[in-house]
Curated annotation (Swiss-Prot):
Belongs to the bacterial ribosomal protein bL12 family. CDD domains: Ribosomal_L7_L12. GO terms for cellular component: cytosolic large ribosomal subunit. Keywords: Ribonucleoprotein, Ribosomal protein. This is Large ribosomal subunit protein bL12. One of its GO terms (biological process) is translation. Forms part of the ribosomal stalk which helps the ribosome interact with GTP-bound translation factors. Is thus essential for accurate translation. The keyword Mitochondrion does not apply. GO terms for molecular function: mRNA binding; structural constituent of ribosome. The lineage of its organism: Bacteria, Pseudomonadati, Pseudomonadota, Betaproteobacteria, Burkholderiales.
Protein backbone atom coordinates (compact mmCIF):
# COMPACT_ATOMS: atom_id res chain seq x y z
CA UNK A 1 0.00 0.00 0.00
CA UNK A 2 1.36 3.43 -1.03
CA UNK A 3 1.48 6.36 1.36
CA UNK A 4 -0.96 9.08 0.32
CA UNK A 5 -0.64 12.81 0.68
CA UNK A 6 -3.32 12.74 3.39
CA UNK A 7 -1.30 10.17 5.37
CA UNK A 8 1.75 12.45 5.24
CA UNK A 9 -0.29 15.48 6.31
CA UNK A 10 -1.75 13.57 9.26
CA UNK A 11 1.70 12.41 10.35
CA UNK A 12 3.15 15.93 10.08
CA UNK A 13 0.15 17.37 11.93
CA UNK A 14 0.78 15.03 14.86
CA UNK A 15 4.46 16.03 15.22
CA UNK A 16 5.85 18.33 17.90
CA UNK A 17 7.80 21.46 17.04
CA UNK A 18 11.10 19.69 17.73
CA UNK A 19 10.13 16.79 15.47
CA UNK A 20 9.12 19.21 12.71
CA UNK A 21 12.44 21.00 13.04
CA UNK A 22 14.26 17.67 12.65
CA UNK A 23 12.07 16.83 9.63
CA UNK A 24 12.93 20.14 7.96
CA UNK A 25 16.65 19.54 8.56
CA UNK A 26 16.32 16.05 7.08
CA UNK A 27 14.62 17.50 3.96
CA UNK A 28 17.38 20.09 3.62
CA UNK A 29 20.11 17.44 3.80
CA UNK A 30 18.35 14.88 1.61
CA UNK A 31 17.34 17.24 -1.21
CA UNK A 32 20.03 19.94 -0.90
CA UNK A 33 17.54 22.77 -0.35
CA UNK A 34 17.12 25.44 2.29
CA UNK A 35 13.81 26.15 4.02
CA UNK A 36 14.95 29.71 4.79
CA UNK A 37 15.44 30.49 1.10
CA UNK A 38 11.97 29.15 0.37
CA UNK A 39 10.40 31.35 3.02
CA UNK A 40 12.20 34.44 1.71
CA UNK A 41 11.24 33.64 -1.87
CA UNK A 42 7.60 33.17 -0.91
CA UNK A 43 7.35 36.41 1.06
CA UNK A 44 7.53 38.88 -1.89
CA UNK A 45 4.70 37.08 -3.65
CA UNK A 46 2.52 37.26 -0.58
CA UNK A 47 3.00 41.01 -0.10
CA UNK A 48 3.17 41.87 -3.78
CA UNK A 49 -0.43 43.02 -4.00
CA UNK A 50 -0.08 45.45 -1.10
CA UNK A 51 3.21 46.82 -2.44
CA UNK A 52 1.70 47.34 -5.88
CA UNK A 53 -1.16 49.38 -4.42
CA UNK A 54 1.07 51.68 -2.38
CA UNK A 55 2.78 54.23 -4.59
CA UNK A 56 6.36 55.04 -3.65
CA UNK A 57 7.39 57.56 -6.31
CA UNK A 58 5.62 60.85 -6.87
CA UNK A 59 5.82 63.72 -9.34
CA UNK A 60 5.34 67.31 -8.15
CA UNK A 61 3.68 69.31 -10.92
CA UNK A 62 3.39 73.09 -10.94
CA UNK A 63 -0.18 73.55 -12.22
CA UNK A 64 -0.59 77.34 -11.94
CA UNK A 65 1.80 80.08 -10.89
CA UNK A 66 -0.68 82.38 -9.16
CA UNK A 67 -0.14 86.07 -8.47
CA UNK A 68 3.27 85.82 -6.71
CA UNK A 69 5.46 84.75 -9.64
CA UNK A 70 8.70 85.91 -7.99
CA UNK A 71 7.95 83.90 -4.84
CA UNK A 72 7.18 80.81 -6.91
CA UNK A 73 10.45 81.19 -8.83
CA UNK A 74 12.34 81.41 -5.52
CA UNK A 75 10.54 78.30 -4.24
CA UNK A 76 11.35 76.40 -7.47
CA UNK A 77 15.02 77.38 -7.15
CA UNK A 78 15.09 76.21 -3.53
CA UNK A 79 13.41 72.88 -4.34
CA UNK A 80 15.30 72.03 -7.53
CA UNK A 81 18.61 73.84 -7.18
CA UNK A 82 18.12 75.38 -10.63
CA UNK A 83 19.58 78.71 -11.63
CA UNK A 84 17.44 81.84 -11.92
CA UNK A 85 16.87 81.57 -15.69
CA UNK A 86 16.06 77.84 -15.58
CA UNK A 87 13.64 78.31 -12.68
CA UNK A 88 11.95 81.25 -14.45
CA UNK A 89 11.59 79.20 -17.65
CA UNK A 90 10.06 76.33 -15.67
CA UNK A 91 7.58 78.67 -13.95
CA UNK A 92 6.71 80.42 -17.24
CA UNK A 93 6.02 77.04 -18.86
CA UNK A 94 3.50 75.87 -16.22
CA UNK A 95 1.98 73.32 -16.01
CA UNK A 96 5.30 71.50 -15.73
CA UNK A 97 6.85 68.92 -13.41
CA UNK A 98 9.09 70.44 -10.75
CA UNK A 99 10.31 67.16 -9.20
CA UNK A 100 9.87 63.66 -10.61
CA UNK A 101 10.26 60.24 -9.01
CA UNK A 102 10.62 61.50 -5.43
CA UNK A 103 9.37 59.92 -2.21
CA UNK A 104 6.17 61.06 -0.50
CA UNK A 105 7.89 63.21 2.14
CA UNK A 106 9.93 65.11 -0.47
CA UNK A 107 6.84 65.57 -2.66
CA UNK A 108 4.78 66.88 0.27
CA UNK A 109 7.57 69.25 1.31
CA UNK A 110 7.90 70.64 -2.24
CA UNK A 111 4.12 71.02 -2.53
CA UNK A 112 3.96 72.96 0.74
CA UNK A 113 6.76 75.34 -0.29
CA UNK A 114 5.17 76.03 -3.67
CA UNK A 115 1.69 76.51 -2.21
CA UNK A 116 3.08 78.85 0.45
CA UNK A 117 4.53 80.91 -2.43
CA UNK A 118 1.06 81.11 -4.03
CA UNK A 119 1.23 78.37 -6.68
CA UNK A 120 -1.26 75.60 -7.35
CA UNK A 121 0.44 72.20 -7.24
CA UNK A 122 -0.53 68.63 -8.13
CA UNK A 123 1.22 65.58 -6.71
CA UNK A 124 0.79 62.48 -8.84
Amino acid sequence: MAITKDDILEAVGAMSVMELNDLVKAFEEKFGVSAAAMAVAAAPGAGGAAAAEEKTEFNVILAEVGSNKVGVIKAVREITGLGLKEAKDLVDGAPKPVKEGVDKATADDAKKKLEDAGAKVDVK
